[in-house]
Amino acid sequence: MASQGTKRSYEQMETGGERQNATEIRASVGRMVGGIGRFYIQMCTELKLSDYEGRLIQNSITMERMVLSAFDERRNKYLEEHPSAGKDPKKTGGPIYRRRDGKWVRELILYDKEEIRRIWRQANNGEDATAGLTHLMIWHSNLNDATYQRTRALVRTGMDPRMCSLMQGSTLPRRSGAAGAAVKGVGTMVMELIRMIKRGINDRNFWRGENGRRTRIAYERMCNILKGKFQTAAQRAMMDQVRESRNPGNAEIEDLIFLARSALILRGSVAHKSCLPACVYGLAVASGYDFEREGYSLVGIDPFRLLQNSQVFSLIRPNENPAHKSQLVWMACHSAAFEDLRVSSFIRGTRIVPRGQLSTRGVQIASNENMDTMDSNTLELRSRYWAIRTRSGGNTNQQRASAGQISVQPTFSVQRNLPFERATIMAAFTGNTEGRTSDMRTEIIRMMESAKPEDVSFQGRGVFELSDEKATNPIVPSFDMSNEGSYFFGDNAEEFEN
């Protein structure tokens, strides 16, 4: 993107740093994941988990959730002020799974939030290490993106369920900061804005008074974040209109839905980061790896290399396919829920199946599920190649505007075409080009009509051997141009429920 000079890299957002050079960024990201690893090791010691139990992804998720809950200031304050039956606002916990007499048993643990905060700070040189917390949030968000569908949420806000590829980061908490904003898809931002506008329509005081002023600032900030994701002048101009509206209402909702649809072809820039479960960083730290000294990047070879050497286990329900469970977690680790399956399959070195064909449910186990029949398996998280993660939408012809596909937001910077069904997308754009945004709408539609599904994106970019850490020899894969690869076709996944 042209404005690259003014932007901080994701790693800087992630670590809250000012402008740094590459070495400093690598060191501060290393410090961040090292802190997560140290926290995890300490928690395993506190709970006296065996090596095997400490490598169980479900245990990792419980501990990640505990530390996120311990630092959730707003929710903690709310819980203090609105005491609910059976919930101690000062405590946090969750299920820990242990191996006893050849069976897995669930044990519910409860800790003081203060104690968890102490352990976390101690692992992070006495600091709050918000960046590490955000990193965990993004890992949970990526896992949700791979596991659940958001059809109901899309329909509720008046959007089309086929726009699911725009929904990256839709389950991220509000407090996820700049790093969180960078990974949110266009659809996610549109949905947040529509919810806000709808509240304003239903509640007369929403935009008024001191609170209303703060609301207005938040609204304009969200508009600017979304504007920054668009890569064409017309889309950005429309966002200015939405932002400057005196009294946002249905006209703005219409404009936003129009923009979301347009992003299926004129894709937005959405960042992708490989955020791994805490236990993976813990294993590396425990084996003596010094992340801060070695340096680390979320968008290069490092996460691939880490997964190459980590053994992580998962609980498996009786009728689940362990290979499918591994695929789900692999996609989550690389933030590849919305990537073209042809590209993901090539990188992973095994065929990745669309979600409708997976025999697996989510990774987390509900409290009412029977543990007696639970088994555990090694997750296969290794890859054949590695590739650089992208923050662009993969638009061709001078990165302005090009082919998209209902259901791809590229993760890897790898040359391919982005096939799409133009008729399907364009059908959504009948008529309505009047009103104050008419010229922009006309311009956007014109750009979409001139997009060709056979255009190549990420020209000349390839994948790399895992031995090629300096990315010197790109291997440019050739894909069957006609066969599109969306993860969501024929989808039967569960809805995400808060």
From Swiss-Prot:
Motif Bipartite nuclear localization signal: positions: 198-216
Record's keyword terms, sorted: Capsid protein, Helical capsid protein, Host nucleus, Host-virus interaction, Ribonucleoprotein, RNA-binding, Viral nucleoprotein, Viral penetration into host nucleus, Virion, Virus entry into host cell
Gene Ontology cellular component list: helical viral capsid; host cell; host cell nucleus; ribonucleoprotein complex; viral nucleocapsid
Region (Disordered): 1-21
Subcellular location, record wording: Virion; Host nucleus
Location, primary (coarse class): virion
Motif Unconventional nuclear localization signal, residue numbers: 1-18
Disulfide bond entries: none
Pfam families (alphabetical): Flu_NP
Any one GO BP annotation for this protein: symbiont entry into host cell
Modifications made to the protein after synthesis: Late in virus-infected cells, may be cleaved from a 56-kDa protein to a 53-kDa protein by a cellular caspase. This cleavage might be a marker for the onset of apoptosis in infected cells or have a specific function in virus host interaction.
Source superkingdom: Viruses
Function: Encapsidates the negative strand viral RNA, protecting it from nucleases. The encapsidated genomic RNA is termed the ribonucleoprotein (RNP) and serves as template for transcription and replication. The RNP needs to be localized in the host nucleus to start an infectious cycle, but is too large to diffuse through the nuclear pore complex. NP comprises at least 2 nuclear localization signals that are responsible for the active RNP import into the nucleus through cellular importin alpha/beta pathway.
Quaternary structure note: Homomultimerizes to form the nucleocapsid. May bind host exportin-1/XPO1. Binds to viral genomic RNA. Protein-RNA contacts are mediated by a combination of electrostatic interactions between positively charged residues and the phosphate backbone and planar interactions between aromatic side chains and bases.
Sequence similarity: Belongs to the influenza viruses nucleoprotein family.
Protein name (record): Nucleoprotein
Species for this entry: Influenza A virus (strain A/Silky Chicken/Hong Kong/SF189/2001 H5N1 genotype A)
